[in-house]
């Protein structure tokens, strides 16, 4: 529920001053590289498909990384997780992999990585999928995530290891889901398989 930059309107400025390889950089304002065709091709995509820009939405996700961030083991992943929330709440559209994803459909993109990597060493997109599916039908919904992130960003308390941070997040999700639903929720045992957890441990060790 926090608002970045004291609620001021966020500008997106095209710039030739970005280092080579950067598509855009989060901040106030967001800087968008005009060294290549990113700006032109993005506006062509918006006109053709009625989409928002995946890349700019990703940078907006970084902008909403507020407060204590000691719990956050990978903000590239969590920037996309915040983007998923924004797309779902507004039925926003993005163009990726030669198709349009609307709202929660974006999770289908991350499921591909989950399916391809979970039985070896799941990648960050696969972890995003496992967390993202929790917020959908049959899961715990978004409210426990909001409460957990609010607690993490205001009070801290997360351990130092990446996998330990992951488990700590699950424990907070369990606590808040139990409080909000009135039923006993253990996210780790009820929504993750042993294969899921072993694969995540390999990635985050």
Give the positions of each predicted feature.
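Surface-exposed patches in mature extracellular/periplasmic domains of secreted proteins
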Residues: 1-14, 70-72, 94-98, 143-151, ...
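Zinc-dependent metallopeptidase catalytic helix centered on the HExxH motif
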Residues: 41-104
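Active-site-proximal alpha-helical
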Residues: 104-197
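Non-catalytic terminal regions of proteins
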Residues: 196-205
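Juxtacatalytic substrate-recognition/specificity segment
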Residues: 1-57
């Amino acid at each position: 529920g926090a608002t970045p930059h004291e609620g001021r309107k966020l500008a997106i400025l095209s710039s030739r001053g970005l280092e080579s390889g950067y598509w855009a950089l989060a901040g106030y304002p967001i800087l968008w590289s005009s060294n290549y065709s990113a700006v032109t091709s993005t506006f062509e995509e918006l006109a053709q498909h009625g989409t928002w820009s995946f890349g700019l939405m990703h940078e907006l996700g970084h902008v909403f990384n507020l407060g204590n961030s000691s719990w956050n083991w990978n903000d590239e992943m969590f920037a996309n997780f915040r983007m998923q929330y924004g797309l779902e709440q507004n039925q926003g559209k993005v163009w990726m992999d030669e198709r349009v994803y609307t709202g929660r459909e974006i999770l289908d993109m991350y499921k591909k990585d989950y399916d391809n990597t979970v039985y070896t060493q799941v990648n960050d997109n696969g972890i995003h999928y496992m967390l993202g599916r929790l917020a959908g039908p049959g899961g715990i919904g978004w409210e426990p995530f909001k409460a957990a992130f609010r607690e993490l960003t205001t009070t801290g308390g997360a351990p130092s290891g990446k996998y330990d941070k992951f488990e700590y997040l699950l424990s907070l999700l369990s606590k808040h889901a139990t409080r909000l639903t009135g039923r006993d929720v253990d996210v780790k045992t009820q929504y993750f398989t042993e294969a899921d957890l072993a694969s995540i441990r390999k990635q985050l060790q």
